[in-house]
Each structure stands twice: as structure tokens, then as C-alpha cells.
């Protein structure tokens, strides 16, 4: 069949146990389409002619990139940690995106279910070579190039840290990520927050990729990282609420937010529109049922209410 059949099969192949371990949940396309508007808003805010990269360190099979144009894709840098997902990502996007981490040659030497060099929370991640035709060979080179804006576009995993020790791939001594250790040491606040994978992704994005006012982060995540943990004390530009029940998970709300890298310690609440997936005048089902795996492209988003 076509590419989307392949994705669906791959999504099913990533058995629920493994998916739960990685904290991964598929992002339904109607939400992706809406979030793509936030990416374009960030791009349109950049100084005229400025180069940029769109970074997704936890891309899975590349659902978030589905609606990007050819031109936009040529700015994208992708990474994912699970081997089956990485192979789908590579086959789907090689030659279309600016870079994929790590290069195929590294992945071919791989053993086990996780990609060597694909762990976004590892110490060496920023210096892992990228497979690219661009001028930067590593993420560190991108970070060091002040003429390139960085726009993050991510739906990070939310599972507990123990997921990292899954299936004996990671020796128990290594089960805490480098970023977790660093965040425990450096984060101003309760160091217990560093146990949460999502917080590690958000904290590390702020630390490494938000360098000046031209850097942005479009993030799918439950709002607690901002509200109670105190991460991303930045200017909120725009966003909406998604129903996490549409992501093969329990019903709860996910904030899809566009953050600009300007400090904001004053704002205590933000108001956004909650959107739910509808098709044929019916609300789309939620939960772990098979129906959720493939929300059709012709489903629409309906504004449910304004939430503060």
C-alpha cells in the first residue's frame, strides 16, 4: 500500500508494552495540522532571510512533519530512539529533510531495539554526527551558529524514567539519563521533577536550543511543566488544548503551545481554546481502543471551550 499504510503497520508493530515504555503516543493528524500553523507563525516572526532549523528530537515515525511543505521540510532535523520507528522515519524523510540523527551507517551497527546515538537525553547527543547535505554536521554546530534560528517542534514522551531500562537494553547502572542527572543538579526547584522524561526534554530544549529571541518551541505536553514545575518561563505566543484521549491514552488535556525565547516570570495564567476531533458530526472516540490509531485526515477540530 501507500506510505500511510506502512506507518499504520509500524505503529501497530510497536507493541503497546514497548510504546508504553517509551512513553510514546501517536499524534492525531487534525492536531498536527493545527500545530503546523504554530510552526509557520514562528517562521514568519523570524528576521527576513534568516536561516532556521525545525528540530524534532523525538519524532517517532514523523507524524508531526506530515503537513510541512517541501521548503519547510528542507529545514527539518529529525531523531528518534526506537529502531523500528527510526527506519520508518529514515525511509520516509531521507533526501527531504536537512538532517537525520544518527546516520544510517551508525544504525546499521545497531543491536537491540534502541538506536545507538538516538538518545536525545544522552551526554553525547549534541556531538553525534547527522546524516545531512547541510553545512552543520552535528547539533552542537547548529547551536554554535548564531545565524540560524532553532524552532523546536516536539511531542515528547511522558513516561517515568524507568522506561529507559527497558528490556535490558540499558544496564541498570545507566538507567538515569545524563540530562536527568544534570537537571537534578542545576534545576532551581524540586529535583524530583527531573525524574519525569517530559521535564527532561523540556529542560534540555531550554538549556541547549533556546539561545536568543529568534528561537521558539512548539510543544505538545500536559501543562504542568509550566504551571507547577516552572519550566518554560517564556513568552507564550499562541496555542490550543488537545484531548490526550485522542492519542491512545487516558482523557486529559495536552497544551500545544508556541513559546518564544524571551523571559516571562510574570504571567500566571494563559487562556486557550480546547479543541476536540469530530467526524461525521460525531465526537471521535478516545482511549486505548483500536479506532484511535488512525484518526482519518478528513476529521476536523471543533472548538469546545476556552480554558484558562
Predicted regions span which residues?
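Class I S-adenosyl-L-methionine
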Residues: 1-91, 96-101, 119, 123-124
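An acidic- and aromatic-residue-enriched active-site/binding cleft used to recognize and process polar
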Residues: 59-62, 81-84, 155-157, 161, ...
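Short catalytic/ligand-binding loop motif for oxyanion handling, primarily in non-cytosolic enzymes
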Residues: 65, 159-163, 211-212, 225-230, ...
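S-adenosyl-L-methionine
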Residues: 92-142
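Internal, well-ordered alpha/beta segment that forms a basic, Gly-enriched binding/recognition surface
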Residues: 144, 148-166
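A mobile, often basic/glycine-rich helix-loop segment
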Residues: 161-194
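Conserved Class I SAM-dependent methyltransferase catalytic core
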Residues: 186-244
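Flexible, glycine-/basic-rich loop-and-beta segments that form/coincide
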Residues: 253-307
